[in-house]
């Protein structure tokens, strides 16, 4: 089973449990804390992925690292994931949990890359346009890449809308070479 499919199943199971117990926001905070710890500790991620470290040792590590940081429900979930030998997928499971929660709440994540820094007015207008087109709430990440020359590229899930001069020049070059 692929990492994405397995991670989504585990995340979906956790989301179902916390929806029933009405602890979604608390669990989201805990998953963000787990994500933060994993992001800052490569050694922990490698240990959780390692086939050389036993299940018992991995569970001990998880208990020591996350004790007091997560609820009993999340700790039980982490132990279950460990028992199924999937702790190496934990970063993906956390990401999938957040993605599923965003889907349920009608939130889309959008990456906007522009050649110059957008003013607040420009950024707000672009975000509002995307929200109107999608009918969803937009969580935007803005970045600047001067190599784009001018314009902007917008990435929504698997779709990229590229309105950059660099992209237009690339298309022009391709058509001239083909001619």
From Swiss-Prot:
Topology versus the membrane: Peripheral membrane protein
Name of this protein: ATP synthase subunit delta
Lineage, top ranks: Bacteria, Pseudomonadati, Chlorobiota, Chlorobiia, Chlorobiales
Primary localization class, coarse: membrane
PANTHER family: ATP SYNTHASE DELTA CHAIN
Known function: F(1)F(0) ATP synthase produces ATP from ADP in the presence of a proton or sodium gradient. F-type ATPases consist of two structural domains, F(1) containing the extramembraneous catalytic core and F(0) containing the membrane proton channel, linked together by a central stalk and a peripheral stalk. During catalysis, ATP synthesis in the catalytic domain of F(1) is coupled via a rotary mechanism of the central stalk subunits to proton translocation.
Molecular function GO terms recorded: proton-transporting ATP synthase activity, rotational mechanism
Source organism: Chlorobium chlorochromatii (strain CaD3)
Keyword presence, Ion transport: yes
Location in or out of the cell: Cell inner membrane
Entry keyword annotation includes Transmembrane helix: no
Pfam family, one: OSCP
Keywords per UniProt: ATP synthesis, Cell inner membrane, Cell membrane, CF(1), Hydrogen ion transport, Ion transport, Membrane, Transport
Gene3D superfamilies: N-terminal domain of the delta subunit of the F1F0-ATP synthase
Family: Belongs to the ATPase delta chain family.
């Amino acid at each position: 089973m692929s990492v994405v499919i397995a991670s989504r199943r585990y995340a979906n199971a956790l989301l179902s449990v916390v929806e029933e117990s009405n602890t979604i926001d608390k669990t989201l905070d805990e998953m963000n804390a787990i994500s933060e710890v994993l992001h800052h500790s490569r050694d922990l991620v490698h240990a959780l992925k390692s086939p050389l470290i036993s299940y018992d040792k991995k569970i001990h590590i998880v208990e020591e690292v996350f004790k007091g940081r997560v609820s009993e429900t999340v700790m039980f979930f982490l132990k279950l994931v460990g028992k199924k030998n999937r702790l190496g997928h934990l970063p993906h499971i956390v990401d999938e949990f957040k993605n599923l929660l965003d889907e349920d709440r009608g939130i889309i994540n959008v990456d906007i890359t522009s050649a110059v820094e957008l003013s607040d007015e420009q950024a707000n207008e672009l975000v509002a346009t995307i929200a109107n087109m999608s009918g969803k709430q937009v969580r935007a990440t803005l970045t600047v890449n001067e190599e784009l020359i001018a314009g902007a590229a917008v990435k929504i899930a698997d779709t990229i809308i590229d309105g950059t001069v660099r992209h237009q020049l690339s298309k022009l070059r391709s058509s001239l070479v083909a001619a």
